Amino acid sequence: AGMGMNFGMTLGAMAGQIGLIFAADWQVWGIPGLILAAIISIPISVLLGIMIGKLLNRAKGREMITSYMIAFAMDGVYQFFVLFMMGPVIPIIHNTLKLPRGYGIRNTVSLLNMRQSLDNLLAVSVGGVKIPVLTLIIIAAACLFILWFRRTKLGQDMRAVGQDMEVARDAGINVERTRVISMVISTVFAGFGMIIYLQNVGNFPTYTAHTQIGMFSIAALLVGGASVE
């Protein structure tokens, strides 16, 4: 939608991590834990996506650097909530997640009981190599969703806005609303992606896991042939 690469996807990653923290605290593991984490991350991602979308509407032409700075700023907000609010304000049941002082989340959250839940659910072994069928199905479904979405009115509106905002506005498209929706969708999917990524690893550093994910994701997009538009 003419907003360039979304460095603000880091905010979605933070939402995904918060979902996983609550899933671990409530001892909901495996696929149910992933679903719970995703459900928790959705409203957080939507709110963050609306916020960043409205901010970027005020920074037209400078979206990428603005989203990068927003990600840095929101990192401080995330750390404040996780380090100081979880425990005294936001209830955390299990002390194994808390810092020794009694509040704040430990530096590493273990997801051992959730590790590779997607990969193992429909795994097929071929020549001693485990093929994560369900993970591949999810990736294929995401690709099909993108192909379908590009043919919808909203998808066409986003393409039009990305090509020329003024022409899109003259055509009756609500440019600002379309840009906000694109950021919401991007942030929600970033949260899902972070959840899938971290369940594969089996643990995550609470305060740094999200910091580089935006760079890695955008590098993957560029290597895959995406343009900055």
Over which residues does each language-model region extend?
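Short, non-helical or kinked segments that cap or interrupt transmembrane helices
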Residues: 1-16, 57-69, 157, 180-181, ...
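Short juxtamembrane and helix-loop transition motifs at transmembrane-helix boundaries
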Residues: 1-3, 24-36, 43, 173-179, ...
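Single transmembrane alpha-helix segments in multi-pass membrane proteins
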Residues: 1-26, 46-61, 221-229
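Alpha-helical transmembrane segments in multi-pass membrane proteins
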Residues: 12-16, 20, 37-49, 71, ...
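Alpha-helical transmembrane segments within multi-pass membrane transporters and channels
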Residues: 28-75
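Transmembrane helix-bundle core of multi-pass membrane transporters
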Residues: 74-151, 205-206
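Membrane-helix/interface signature in polytopic inner-membrane proteins
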Residues: 143-183
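Transmembrane alpha-helical segments in multi-pass inner-membrane proteins
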Residues: 184-192, 196-229
